[in-house]
Amino acid sequence: MARDVKKVVLAYSGGLDTSVILKWLQTTYKCEVITFTADLGQGEELEPARKKAQLLGIKDENIFIEDVREEFVAEYVFPMFRANAVYEGLYLLGTSIARPLIAKKQIEIARKMGADAVSHGATGKGNDQVRFELGYYALEPEITVIAPWREWDLTSRTRLLEFAEQHQIPIAKDKRGEAPFSVDANLLHSSSEGKVLEDPAEDAPEYVYQRTISPEAAPDEPTIITIAFDKGDAVAINGEALSPATLLTKLNELGKANGIGRLDLVENRFVGMKSRGVYETPGGTILLAAHRGIESITLDRGAAHLKDELMPRYAELIYNGFWFSPEREMLQAAIDHSQAYVTGEVTVKLYKGNTTVIGRKSPYSLYNQELVTFEEGAVAYDHRDAAGFIKLNALRLRTLGSRARKISE
């Protein structure tokens, strides 16, 4: 039984699935549909989404298309990279970090337009349904959420196509067959899942990779770049100041040309199952290496190690959809505080899939060459001081060793 809904804001891509959802909302809920399409840097022309929505009966004033690339990178990607966040040691969270922004924009439009519901196209098996809906409820606790994939009976590609034809929804010729895999993309990354990728024992076909050339085909000469940071955020490449989105776009181009950022992994979804994904994050891979490089000379050991302890929890919160939670905000405050002196330049070598930091400098560097040199310096390190340091740190180990020997006698 459909709930009483007057207006719904749909996260709309213009593709087959969300176009079917649009019409399904109209026919099932008899409600007014408002579409929101975000330009997150996915590399697609978005005007066709406007035309498709118009064709399906959406009024011009109910069609929202917004370029959110700068906001996405500055307010979501960069804060995450200050934490060096990776999920399960590998995944750079490219899909996860985009969902809170989409949810936020939908809620803003719902308030502006007086809508009482929001809707998304995430399936009932994946993480995205959780990410979207946790965002909705955090920002608008009483909002009605419609998740068509959990409600309708269009459970196969054939049924979707039949519904589309029944309701005169245009279908591109290349969309009539079963897609070999599903793709999600934004300025940070692209992800490919399903179908030909479902067997984790099988190598991903080369045609799956759209954002990077293979490392084997990359140039035989390395590319050397310098990235400047200011308080933990990248601000320039090779001396040229760039906006956040422009900088990430440039890093993507450099990474693509050098075969950088490919990742094939099996991850643990929040909903309980394991899934295999193929990810391409060329610019993000470079950015992470460079950020860790500048932190290596500007962060105190205790702060650096604490950050590394906090990072897995922070990454898990983002992966699971808790961007708007108080615990994520608490961790963010600590992480941001740690970046006060993370300013300087990092030189990186890009070569056949590898990202190597080869130089780093900062006006706030904690690296003291006179302390680490093997030569005698003005600030000499007295080697004899180490004896007492070792003796004190060995005290508990010697005590434990003595007990173990007594027990064994």
UniProtKB/Swiss-Prot annotation:
Compartments (UniProt record): Cytoplasm
One Pfam family of this chain: Arginosuc_synth
GO biological process, one term: L-arginine biosynthetic process
A single MF term (Gene Ontology): ATP binding
Binding site for L-aspartate: T123, N127, D128
Entry keywords, A to Z: Amino-acid biosynthesis, Arginine biosynthesis, ATP-binding, Cytoplasm, Ligase, Nucleotide-binding
Annotated residues for binding of ATP: A11, Y12, S13, G14, G15, L16, D17, T18, S19, A38, G121
This protein's pathway: Amino-acid biosynthesis; L-arginine biosynthesis; L-arginine from L-ornithine and carbamoyl phosphate: step 2/3
HAMAP family membership: Arg_succ_synth_type1
Recorded catalytic activity of this chain's protein: L-citrulline + L-aspartate + ATP = 2-(N(omega)-L-arginino)succinate + AMP + diphosphate + H(+)
InterPro entries hit by this protein: Arginosuc_syn_C, Arginosuc_syn_N, Arginosuc_synth, Arginosuc_synth_CS, Arginosuc_synth_type_1_subfam, AS_cat/multimer_dom_body, Rossmann-like_a/b/a_fold
Protein name: Argininosuccinate synthase
EC number from the UniProt entry: 6.3.4.5
The protein's assembly and partners: Homotetramer.
Family of this protein: Belongs to the argininosuccinate synthase family. Type 1 subfamily.
Amino-acid biosynthesis in keyword set: yes
GO cellular component: cytoplasm
Naturally occurring in which organism (per UniProt): Xanthobacter autotrophicus (strain ATCC BAA-1158 / Py2)
Binding, L-citrulline: Y91, S96, N127, R131, S182, S191, E267, Y279
